[in-house]
């Protein structure tokens, strides 16, 4: 393993005028870079730092970032989550990381956990660039016709890894109408100057407002670990979740090499949903089933074995 340099604070702009912030974990030499996205309503502090350090020690410059309205990043209302916008902001993160002298622009990967895994799938599906050039085009660039576009080497992302991704964010059917009613009430109130309406991120029994189920002790555990997670999410977050389906995008990830890491007994982000998404993905792709593991308990015990499989995938696909 290589010696570790200290992480440092960074910030980057987005096309829609927001400043996002994160931590850069620089490798000791020029080489691949990877952007790591946290789970739903989670700051970069949750799990991601340990993963970044692990890959940093193996010569990958890593960027952990706070999505809009979370943690240190700008954006109002706070805890107002939009998967489509988060995917767009990942594009801006790629652009920012590509300018770092430690990063080979032909070897940039995406890594996402849970909801971050969903957004990573979407961003990888949409990451194209004209004429096979990774990041640049002349000012006021105009394509005279589709015949002039060369798409042979058109993906900016060299590889992607999606870990325990949340695939279906719509929740239980019986929760649909109440969420929509609250969302319309909230919209009308905000037009009159009211503050945004919030719901708990996780209830005491581990349930989520749209009916999904998380561990009942999740929030107390995060608090004990000192991870600053706000236990609230805007009603509009769940409205947007009803309109979002990453399954419509995953077939477009190819030809970007993709790895899906799926816990065998994932209840929070059901294993069957992850496998359904994987089936729709084109080649090249690899599936790593974490035998006997649930949504997050893979981070305890044999995590080195799991991450080494991911490192092997990245080395083979990005040639480093």
Curated annotation (Swiss-Prot):
Polyketide transferase; part of the gene cluster that mediates the biosynthesis of fujikurins A-D, secondary metabolites playing a role during rice infection. The polyketide synthase PKS19 acts with the trans-enoyl reductase FFUJ_12240 and the polyketide transferase FFUJ_12241 to produce fujikurins, however, the biosynthesis pathway has not been identified yet. Belongs to the polyketide transferase af380 family. Its EC number is 2.3.-.-. It comes from the Eukaryota. Gene3D superfamilies: 1.10.10.800, alpha/beta hydrolase. This is Polyketide transferase FFUJ_12241. It is an enzyme of class 2 (transferase). One of its GO terms (molecular function) is transferase activity. It comes from Gibberella fujikuroi (strain CBS 195.34 / IMI 58289 / NRRL A-6831). The keyword Coiled coil does not apply. InterPro entries: AB_hydrolase_1, AB_hydrolase_fold, Polyketide_trans_af380. Keywords: Transferase. Pfam families: Abhydrolase_6. Residues 58-298 are annotated as: Abhydrolase domain. SUPFAM superfamilies: alpha/beta-Hydrolases. Induction: The fujikurins gene cluster is specifically expressed during rice infection.
